[in-house]
Amino acid sequence: MKIICQKINLLKSVNISLKAVPSKTTMPILECILIDATTNQIKFTTNDMELGIETIVDGTIEEKGIIALDAKIFYEIIRRLPDNTVTIKTDEKLTATITCEKAKFTIPGKSGEDFAYLPLIEKEESLTISQFTLKEMIRQTIFSIASNETNKLMTGELFEIKNNYLKIVSLDGHRIAIRRMELKKDYADRKVVVPGKTLNEISKILSGEIDDIVNILSLIHI
């Protein structure tokens, strides 16, 4: 595999991807970031088995391939590189060589086949709302999520689409928070409970800009 990207694009995608890298795990492969250049896009994937993140990185693919690299080591290398073009090349021994100007790093990788891939999402009719709106709805309800994990449902938020409204509900046994917004078109009724940890990370990723939109493709895997 050989890909060429600008440092700024790599760093942006790695920063987002790190939010789905577990701090502790019995599966070392989950500490990795999957770099997939087997198609016409460069994709970074991380997965802690609760939250999975896939980002598309702007760049050029000169040789197709796939590799899993330790996410934190990869981040530290990219962070310290000069603000210029970065080349990532792998060999048959799964060794990755990262070069930028006069800087050169070599780190061992793992087979992409061992990685915990994200589930294939069956795309329903996508719900499109502004990133600002979703970020605000999460912010105004997440404080009522229970911290006690004896009741898993209370550690998440209910997302429900019904009667042309999106409703988000959280409760911890003592208080309840509800936020509703009218949708601009009709959608089929559906609902799902999303873990609070996942929503916290999603909220950090959302830009908070009114003009930026987010497409919710499925309320099974949100």
Regions found by a protein language model. Give the residues of each.
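Structural preference for solvent-exposed beta-strand-turn elements
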Residues: M1-I220
